[in-house]
Swiss-Prot record:
Belongs to the protein kinase superfamily. Tyr protein kinase family. Fibroblast growth factor receptor subfamily. Present in an inactive conformation in the absence of bound ligand. Ligand binding leads to dimerization and activation by autophosphorylation on tyrosine residues. It is found in: Cell membrane; Endosome; Endoplasmic reticulum. This is Fibroblast growth factor receptor 4. It comes from Coturnix coturnix. PANTHER family: FIBROBLAST GROWTH FACTOR RECEPTOR 4, TYROSINE-PROTEIN KINASE RECEPTOR. It catalyses: L-tyrosyl-[protein] + ATP = O-phospho-L-tyrosyl-[protein] + ADP + H(+).
Amino acid sequence: MLPLWLVLAGLLLAVGPAASHRGEMEPDSLASGDDDEDSDGDGPHGDRSEEPVYMHRAPYWTHPHRMDKKLYAVPAGNTVKFRCPASGSPSPSIRWFKNGREFRGEHRIGGIRLRHQHWSLVMESVVPSDRGNYTCLVENRFGRIRYSYLLDVLERSPHRPILQAGLPANTTALVGSDVEFFCKVYSDAQPHLQWLKHIEVNGSSYGPDGVPYVQVLKTADINSSEVEVLYLRNVTMEDAGEYTCLAGNSIGLSYQSAWLTVLPEEELVHEAETSEAKYTDIIIYTSGSLAVAMALIIVVLCRMQTQSSKQPLEPMAVHKLSKFPLIRQFSLDSSSSGKSSTSLMRVTRLSSSCAPMLAGVVEMDLPLDSKWEFPREKLVLGKPLGEGCFGQVVRAEAYGIDRQWPDRAVTVAVKMLKDNATDKDLADLISEMEMMKLMDKHKNIINLLGVCTQDGPLYVIVEFAAKGNLREYLRARRPPTPDYTFDITELHEEQLCFKDLVSCVYQVARGMEYLESRRCIHRDLAARNVLVTAENVMKIADFGLARDVHDIDYYKKTSNGRLPVKWMAPEALFDRVYTHQSDVWSFGILMWEIFTLGGSPYPGIPVEELFKLLKEGHRMDCPSNCTHELYMLMRECWHAVPLQRPTFKQLVEGLDKILAAISEEYLDLSMPFEQYSPSCEDTTSTCSSDDSVFTHDPMPLAPCLFSCPSGRT
């Protein structure tokens, strides 16, 4: 048996060199106390206990499966972290490159965080300028490896908080039970949330100013999911009522409400039994009614079939022209072969002593509408005012169209077909006429005054706007530049102030609010389709070309006609779906036109690039003359989610407050002025989307403003 001291000496000799060797190759790794998610063994020596010990080794990736994602597409404002966990012997170093150049903290506003012990690069609050190719280079004296990431930063539109639809939801509960209301909030800026309960004070739910009385139940910044839930324990009858989730950030407020109904247990059971009995009765009565209705329909159809086999088809007397089918396309060279189809109206060739023959058009024998019919002989046509896709507009004098003054001539505008019009063009003009008949008089739309449908070509008589369309009205009142000048004697009379521009926006919003109330989608709202009267009243035109949507809330355009691309909402542009919300988007573009005095939207951007930018969330910048409040209104109109855009009613209310608060400031027409890109002229026809604005012209600028002189009213 060996002495104890000899055994211990042998152990020391065996263990000592190995321990000493390990101490040279594995220095202690640095701790990371400020990034818990990185403390997972990704440090330069975090996994050393699981790997064999090498005296010398080139760098290698320790967690390659965590580096599969090469492309990072993140919204602006987020934090981005790139990681290249590696190891080697001796311990390698890591450097970062952006687009081929070494990347340091001073190269970026806001700086960067390089965590060498965790092989990571961290960038907080990324912005579009951070886009690029990021490469990590890991090396020691035995070799080097590299890996690249591609970062794309998507711009976000600043917006008020978005609340998830349907939350909070109406709830019915028993006395003594527990209730939870949920409210999901989406917001880029730090949101604040309050849960409110609506209460009564002195028997009234609203104060003298129309603001409801509420009790604040819960309020906090949203830092956890707990804040988005309202818990009501052991509810009583007094807890019944309306509850509101109110969320706000630096941009604005959003809220949604729900009702809590509290019932005694016996009442709930009774209601369930009563409801079941009612449903049974409804099913019985409905089934019987359907059986009787089906029998009647079968009898009527059989009788109609019998009569149609014995009698020739007679022309139908229908009041609404939209009930008539479209007549087939007519050609001068067509023969009367079996290709013709039966029409529900008498078809004749258009011929009139006061108008040339229209090529390729047959005339519909339209029924007389005594409410709107105007004697053709009392209409004196004048000079042309312009033309559109299928018709032309001429100035005219209508004698006696104002029934209060039967002998007085009123200046009007008359819509008629062009010489090269087709059957479809005639049907479109009739459709526009019928749409306008459905509208009541409104100050901010072009109103129908009369029609001429008998003994000649179709004339649609509408209000006359002396100052033309809004786009040209604004451009004619721009400050002079070397490339864009006008008569200096007109400056004082035509001088615009900031309040005038807001008034233009407000009036158009009022007109669209009315059209929205009549379930009319415009589909082509732009400054070129807003007319200006001699009294500077804004009137929306060409809404008759819109589709009436009584049954559905959207209209899908299926034809491949040319479209006003720059004014179209993304859902209309990419999916061809038109709603009142897509009109709101176009209204935002129109606002931009107004505050740039008729500038062309997205100047210098090709169509293909515009599609890409819209999908990425890019929006036009704020015009110089536009306040932040008005620009945020534009941005709300350009919200990517249609239902998150304001309604025209909300726009009118907001603009009314802005208009009442602002002072009148004139455009400074005496100072040097940068051009608005007058070379970026749009086509005069609303049919064309092939617009020269998509050439690379300079960005339009806006004029300076100065306080209006005293005496301005």
